[in-house]
UniProtKB/Swiss-Prot annotation:
Coiled-coil stretches noted in the UniProt entry, renumbered to this chain: none
Presence of keyword NAD: yes
Underlying gene: nuoC
Catalytically driven reaction(s): a quinone + NADH + 5 H(+)(in) = a quinol + NAD(+) + 4 H(+)(out)
Protein's recorded name: NADH-quinone oxidoreductase subunit C
Role description: NDH-1 shuttles electrons from NADH, via FMN and iron-sulfur (Fe-S) centers, to quinones in the respiratory chain. The immediate electron acceptor for the enzyme in this species is believed to be ubiquinone. Couples the redox reaction to proton translocation (for every two electrons transferred, four hydrogen ions are translocated across the cytoplasmic membrane), and thus conserves the redox energy in a proton gradient.
EC number(s) stated in the UniProt entry for this protein: 7.1.1.-
Location relative to the cell: Cell inner membrane
Length: 200
């Protein structure tokens, strides 16, 4: 008798055919990778095909692969990764799509297929700069209105570009260039025999 994962894998291959770029299994989970041009059509099939029946999108996030594998990775930089759930069949699927353009990463929005994608896509836009084409309200959701850049990108500086502080003279919050100076921290070496109650 075939396992649930084997049944799901066979159903996905039968329903999607050549639209499957890759379908891999790791630690009991399936990951389906599709091209950006097939993304919406595949998502509709995943939801509507009675042998698949993924009724819920339970998570969506962006991923920046710029330094993946210690910089040895040579594929597209940005991906949108969705976690799908079929309550009917009691199985899950990870759906990954890579944005074809690294300079302006655009993929289709899944809001019309799963409404739960709304805020997840806004979060991926805000933090990674992924543009979800067809999203009804694609604006920042976590960072401030005037925030510059996308803080989860691998090339975003750790200290950021600007800092925010309250100015008592202006009686409002103001932005100014970052004033954090890089420093080197030297670890303190404690050479006590009984430090912290430990016996040596």
């Amino acid at each position: 008798m075939a396992s649930k994962i084997e049944i799901l894998k066979a159903n996905l291959e039968a329903a999607l055919g050549a639209r499957v770029v890759s379908l891999t299994e790791a630690i009991g989970e399936l990951t389906l990778v599709v091209k950006a041009s097939d993304y919406l059509e595949v998502a509709k099939t995943l939801r509507d095909d009675p042998k698949l029946c993924f009724e819920q999108l339970i998570d969506l996030c962006g991923v920046d692969y710029q330094t993946y594998g210690d910089g040895a990775y040579d594929g597209p930089r940005f991906a949108a990764v969705s976690q799908l759930l079929s309550v009917t069949n009691n199985w899950r699927l990870r759906l990954r799509v890579f944005a074809p353009d690294d300079d302006l990463p655009i993929v289709a929005s899944l809001v019309d297929i799963w409404t739960s994608a709304n805020w997840y896509e806004r979060e991926a836009f805000d933090l990674y700069g992924l543009v979800f084409e067809g999203h009804p309200d694609l604006r920042r959701i976590l960072t401030d209105y005037g925030f510059i850049g996308h803080p989860f990108r691998k090339d975003f500086p750790v200290s950021g570009y600007v800092e925010m502080r309250y100015d008592p003279e202006e009686k409002r919050v103001v932005y100014q260039p970052v004033t954090i100076e890089p420093r080197e921290i030297t670890p303190r070496v404690i050479r006590e025999d009984r430090y912290g109650g430990l016996k040596h």
